[in-house]
Amino acid sequence: MAAEGPLTGRLALVSGASRGLGRATAVELAAAGAYVVCTARSTRTGATQTDVDDLTLEGTLDAVRAAGGDGEWHRCDHTEPDQVEALLRGVLDRHGRVDVLVNNAWGGHDHHEEADGEEVWDEPMEQFRAMLLGGAYSDYVTTLLTLRLAMGPARSGLVLTTTWHTPEPPAWVPYESSKAAKNRLVYALGYHLQDKGIGVVAVAPGWMRTELMEAHVAPEVLAGKTESPHLAGRVMAALAADPEVMRWTGQVVDVGELADHYEIDDLDGTRPHGNAGRYRPSPVPPPLPGEGG
């Protein structure tokens, strides 16, 4: 039996759900009662990351069920409109609704190339294109098709996008620019959907202890500077359950700010802002190659 909670009876679709923030979000939404449709490109017969065991959709669904929730998984490349439309039509045929969309797909680091030199103009041209496709474009495709087929006709729903607050001064040019495109898309969609009862919110976590980060970064580097991806997942579950979620629409909101607002702690009881023993994640580097979020 699925978990009972504030999202019972709701269906959430989470892209990029095979690992990291996507997996944690699927688990937290399911723990709050939602039926979760998990999508990504990585399966046990074709994993895109092998540095850590079972970073796959099947592994995510196992974690969802271990948390007392339920759902299903489907392999989908969210840069391909035909695949996304087929996915959504199948979900609607089986369940009749999509209440929450979490845009977490991110493929740009799969094409990571080191610059040949140290100057900004030495950056490979392909890098920015790959990040735009894996980030803002996949968000655009998935959101518009979800609006067209499900949320628009229902005049209800919530679109959540995982992103990054680009720093000042800016760092890695293709990464910062592609994240800025994601953020502006949220602002533009929020503006155009504000009178239709559909919220669009970007959620910006800090430096997360994902599976790949813990496998590649020394524990002493992570200590005191990081949060688990479950903190952002819990925040997104709270947003999905909030009847006044439209207060955040069109905005990029820091996970720490939302955790304070909803009084949510991380798995270890910490929170990015607030009382003694809590931390503020800084500085934050770009994700590891192949990492989502």
Describe each model-derived feature in a short phrase:
Residues 202, 219-293:
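C-terminal helical subdomain
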Residues 10, 69-70, 97-98, 150-163, ...:
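Active-site loop of short-chain dehydrogenase/reductase
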Residues 29, 97, 183, 193-208, ...:
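Conserved Rossmann-fold SDR core element
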Residues 1-95, 107-119, 126, 290:
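Short-chain dehydrogenase/reductase
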